Amino acid sequence: MNTQQLAKLRSIVPEMRRVRHIHFVGIGGAGMGGIAEVLANEGYQISGSDLAPNPVTQQLTSLGATIFFNHRPENVRDASVVVVSSAISADNPEIVAAHEARIPVIRRAEMLAELMRFRHGIAIAGTHGKTTTTAMVSSIYAEAGLDPTFVNGGLVKAAGVHARLGHSRYLIAEADESDASFLHLQPMVAIVTNIEADHMDTYHGDFENLKQTFINFLHNLPFYGRAVMCVDDPVIRELLPRVGRQTTTYGFSEDADVRVEDYQQIGSQGHFTLLRQGMPDLHVTLNAPGRHNALNAAAAVAVATEEGIDDDAILRALESFQGTGRRFDFLGEFPLEPVNGKAGTAMLVDDYGHHPTEVDATIKAARAGWPDKKLVMLFQPHRYTRTRDLYDDFANVLTQVDALLMLDVYPAGEAPIPGADSRSLCRTIRNRGKIDPILVSDPAQVATMLAPVLTGNDLILVQGAGNVGKIARYLSEIKLKPQIQEEEQHG
């Protein structure tokens, strides 16, 4: 950003006084790195620490950030403020050193709230669909020439980044309910896609507590703000009378203010009509598969319509939508060795979904777009607590595929829980008699164990939120062909 552009931005968004150097602990996370990228482009000195390099840290380094691949007290020297992710413990040496030096230590959402404070904030919350909906809203606003700032939890593929600094007053951000930190945000517009039981440790196992927290989040809207909510979700429908703000509903339901009708999927595209009260119908071609993505698009259209964005810009953005990283991410179609003398191919798709509802939506999208293909899933459960709490739901959903390979649970720092492991889940699924899951204890053997399952007309879904995405990229690099020596580092 040049001096003239920065001066224009400062006329809209004042700088944070006395803050020059911002240090991020856990800077390699998508949410942390996105905020760091916006602040780097605003001209602040950025440093941060994490355990290993990744694409996020590489991008930040290219912007001039100083990245340490360790956690040491001296890393916070001269910092004006230290930003921490929810994954960082209070005894981290950098946090301890910051407290001793009387440097303010704040959570990621507090910094995001500061970015939003002087902007027209649009926050996207909900158990599922936040990242894709954030990208859709950002794409529509960009297509309309509104040059928004956005901060997303996943890679916005059209932009090639998780976050971007725009020169307008608009800030579009994913709002994270996993640690209730979205309560720091005070947006002008809030989308809530759905509300389900997840991250229940944060809410002390009390679903009513979770629901009330979403209401509290919506009460952060000014009285002239707007809540955009999916009326198909039974919990949202129940909570609507308690919102106390202007509300637009969307969904397939007949009473939705923005209603999805006549949905059909052809390959990776969805085709449907959006009915809007007092506005012309929109005949949408969406470059993303699945009914769940039609709902995400309806939310984005509801916000754009409220802002007065031209319908042609909305339709162009949705038809050209490039998606987000690891959300039904098509990695390629690869030729296979002939099976019974007949050559064939397998499609490879990488998807971040790790909750039963998300996995179910991905399976349905795959079935709708490619009904004749054998659906093979490589699944990695994420967290022992989630596997325990949603065990039966996982067992029900995972039996819908034609073949299942399952990796060990990605612990995300949790200790193992007896009976909430992959071996137990495989046994439960096997006992139901529909499919015979294969437990993959060694990630380095995935390609070898996958090969006999494939028929030459396959769609492989690599599913989960842990390091299974690295395996997906490795399978793409080797074109699904088992290597003589498969290195465990690719797991």
Swiss-Prot record:
InterPro entries: Mur-like_cat_sf, Mur_ligase_C, Mur_ligase_C_dom_sf, Mur_ligase_cen, Mur_ligase_N, MurCDEF_pg_biosynth, UDP-N-AcMur_Ala_ligase_MurC. It catalyses: UDP-N-acetyl-alpha-D-muramate + L-alanine + ATP = UDP-N-acetyl-alpha-D-muramoyl-L-alanine + ADP + phosphate + H(+). Pathway: Cell wall biogenesis; peptidoglycan biosynthesis. It is an enzyme of class 6 (ligase). One of its GO terms (cellular component) is cytoplasm. It holds the Pfam family Mur_ligase. The keyword Transcription regulation does not apply. The keyword Transferase does not apply. It comes from the Bacteria. ATP binds at residues 126-132. Keywords: ATP-binding, Cell cycle, Cell division, Cell shape, Cell wall biogenesis/degradation, Cytoplasm, Ligase, Nucleotide-binding, Peptidoglycan synthesis. GO terms for molecular function: ATP binding; UDP-N-acetylmuramate-L-alanine ligase activity. GO terms for biological process: cell division; cell wall organization; peptidoglycan biosynthetic process; regulation of cell shape. NCBIfam families: murC. Belongs to the MurCDEF family. Cell wall formation. This is UDP-N-acetylmuramate--L-alanine ligase. It comes from Salmonella choleraesuis (strain SC-B67). The gene is murC.
